[in-house]
Amino acid sequence: IIEESRRSEQFSDFTPIPCKGFNILCKAKRYGRWWVLKGLKKPYRQDENYKNLLHKEFDILISLQHPNIVSAYSMEEIPEMGTCIVMEWIDGITLEHWSGSKTEGEAIFLQLLDAVHYIHAKQIVHRDLKPSNIMITHNGNHVKLIDFGLSDTDDFAILKQPAGTPGYISPEQIVSQQADIRNDIFSIGCILEKILPGKPYTAIIKRCKAPITQRYANIDELKADFMARRNSHLSGIKRIAIAALACIILFGFISYPLLHQQEKSISITPAHHEAKKDTVIRQQAKKPAPLSNGQKSLQPTATEPSSASQAQAAELIS
């Protein structure tokens, strides 16, 4: 039963958030801050089983304090909504609508592993890990794991039944076997396949989705393999980049002398040689041929005008 002090009429600006199943979600403002209210749809509000599920989710959330997990603050009676969990508002999108680089995807996946490792250490199995239950903030691609409505612990026996989402639920969950952390590891493999498909993580995806006895035993083992393959891949890229740079430098050392030699060889090319030869011939043709002994030049000189010129001048004077 919710105490009188926990009743609240101070929320405003209610904005419904689309939600499947038996829950209702609403964004609302109080004290200048946005919150998320999570309650039950009207047909389920008087059902003790569903009321217990909501209380169980609150008890789990209030016990978790992790930067990559949504924070719950209280459970209050909200007009028109009934009993609700009051949670932080996350300004972002779900992973199913996210797109980014491979490096960003790797950072997101590592944050997810940290969050799941934390809840597993507290003996909590999420049981519904999927892209729509992983929020990515607009500011900094910060991961927030949400929706612990199907989560299970050793302290709660209410969910010893099939739970999960097709495409992400493990085979053993489908046949209603008891949940353990390897169910979440199967789902993590499906998520990894969505955001980082192919090499170098193909083997990790395959092992996550293998029969339960062949999967990673825990998140630590999975993370160690992920980091090893990531670092190995980065080292391979660096080696390729260094080799390419070395080839460029080597090509420069080899090609520079050849280009320099080619510039020098321009002066002795046949065409240049013929042009130079023709210039010399033209210059020689302008010079008078040397006279032999006793020969007189047929060309008039500047100091000695020809006899024809002298006769013409005399005629003009007369």
Where do the language-model regions lie?
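Conserved activation segment of eukaryotic-like protein kinases, specifically the C-terminal portion
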Residues: 159-172
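Short beta-strand micro-motifs within the conserved protein kinase catalytic domain, predominantly
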Residues: 71-83
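Activation segment signature within eukaryotic-like protein kinase domains
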Residues: 108-109
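Conserved short submotifs of the Hanks-type protein kinase catalytic core
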Residues: 80-93
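Catalytic-loop of the protein kinase fold
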Residues: 120-136
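AlphaC helix of the eukaryotic protein kinase fold
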Residues: 44-63
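A conserved short helix/loop substructure at the end of the activation segment
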Residues: 209-221
